[in-house]
Amino acid sequence: LVQEKELISKIVWRLMPFLGVLYLIAYIDRQNVSYAKLEMVGALGMSEYAYGLGASLFFIGYFLFEVPSNLFLNRFGASRWFARIMITWGIVTVALAYTQNATMFYILRFLLGVAEAGFFPGVLYLLTLWFPKDYRGRMVGLFMIFSALANAVGAPIGGMLLDLNGLLGHAGWQWVFLATGIPAVLAGIVTFFYLDDTPEKAKFLTEDEKRWLHDRLARENSGMEEHADNGFKALVNPRVLLMALCYIGFPLAAYGLSYWLPTIVRGFGVSNTTNGFINIIPWVIVALALWVVPAAADRAESKTPYIVGPAFVGAICLALSALVTSPTLQFTFLCVAAAGIFAGQPVFWSLPSRFLRGAGAAAGIAAINSVGNLGGFVAQNVVPWIRDSTGNDILPMVFLAICLAVAGVLVIIVGRMLAARQAISV
C-alpha cells in the first residue's frame, strides 16, 4: 500500500534540492549583471541607460525562444534539455567576462537570454509531471526560495568578486562573470546523469509508487481541454493570454528592484563588500514569505487573495520607500516590498496547470512566463532612464509600485473571469 505523504516526501527530497541548486546557479548568473554594472559601466564607457538596454536584451532573447524551448523539453526530456540550457548559458556568461565594447555586450546578453530560455517554465512544467495539484503551490514556492537564496548569496559574492580587481590580470567585473559561468557548465553535465525525465523512468520509485502517481495524475488531468499532443493550441487560449497579461507586473517589479537595489544601497556610502552583505537581508525575508504564503494558499479554496494581497503590500512599500528620506526607512520598506513582490508568484503558477496538461502545459506556461518576463525588459530600461532623468536613485520605485498595483488589479479581474468560466477555482 502506497503512503501518499511518504511518496511525496521521497520525490521532494530527490528533485527539489537539485532543481533548487540549478535555480540558485541560474539566478546568481542572471543577477550578476547588477553587480558587474558597478564597475563595468566605467570600464566600457557606457551610460546607465545604455547599460540597462544591454542588460535588458537578455529578455528579448528569452521571450523569443521560451516557448520553443519548452516544447523541445517536452520532446527530448528534462535531463538532456536542462543540461543543454545550463552548458550553453555558462559558456555565454564566461564570454561576457571578455566583453570589449558595448556592441559585444549587447550581443552576448541577447544570446544569454536565448540560452537560458525555457529553464524556469521548464521546471514548472516538470513539477506537473511529478506532483499532484494540491502540492504544486508549495513546490513552486520551495523552488523559488532558491531565487531568494541566490540573491542573498549572490549579493556578498558579487561584492567580494568586485574586490578581486586586478587578480590574475582580470578586473573585478570580469571575475563576477567567470565565477558564475563556470559552475553552470559543470552543473549542466551533472544534470544529464542525475535528473529523471518522468516518474515512469525513475529508478528511485517502486512500481507500486509509479502506478499510484500515474493514476492520481491521470484522474486530475481527465477532462482538460489542452491535450498532450497540441502545444500550439495553448498559445491562443484566451486564459493563457490573460494570465500572461497579469504576470507582466510581477517580473517588472522583481527585476526592477533586484537590479537597482545594489545601486540604492551603494548610495548609502558603503563599500562593495558591505553593500553585498546588506543586500542579504531582503532576500532572507523573501525566502520566508515564499514558504508561508504558498503553503497557506494550498490549504485555501480561493487562491486570488494570496496573489493579490502580497502584491498590494509590495506596491505600497515601494511607494513609501520613495517618500521617506531616512536610508534606514527606505531600506526597511524595500525589504517588505521584496517579500510582497515574490510571495504570491508561486500561487499564481499553480493556476495554469489546473486547465493545461502535456505539451499544452509546456507551451502555455512558457508563453505566460515569456510574455510576463518582458516586464524585465521594461524595468531594466525604464528604471535607469528615470534615474538618469531625475538624478534620484530611489524615485524609480514609484514606477515599480504603480506597475505592481496594476498587476494586482488585473489578477482580480482575470480571476473572476476564470472562475466565471468554471475552469479553475480561484
How should these model regions be labeled?
Residues 33-34, 233-290, 345, 349, ...:
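Extracytoplasmic gate region of multi-pass secondary transporters
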Residues 45, 77, 98-104, 115, ...:
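Helix-breaking motifs and short loop linkers at transmembrane-helix boundaries and internal kinks
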Residues 64-103:
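Conserved MFS/SLC helix-loop-helix module at the cytosolic interface between two early adjacent transmembrane helices
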Residues 65-77, 289-302, 387:
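Helix-to-loop junctions at the C-terminal end of transmembrane segments
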Residues 108-145:
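Cytoplasmic helix-loop-helix junction between adjacent transmembrane helices
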Residues 137-162, 183-184, 369-379:
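Glycine-rich segments within core transmembrane alpha-helices of 12-TM secondary carriers
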Residues 303-351:
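C-terminal transmembrane helical hairpin of 12-TM major facilitator-type secondary transporters
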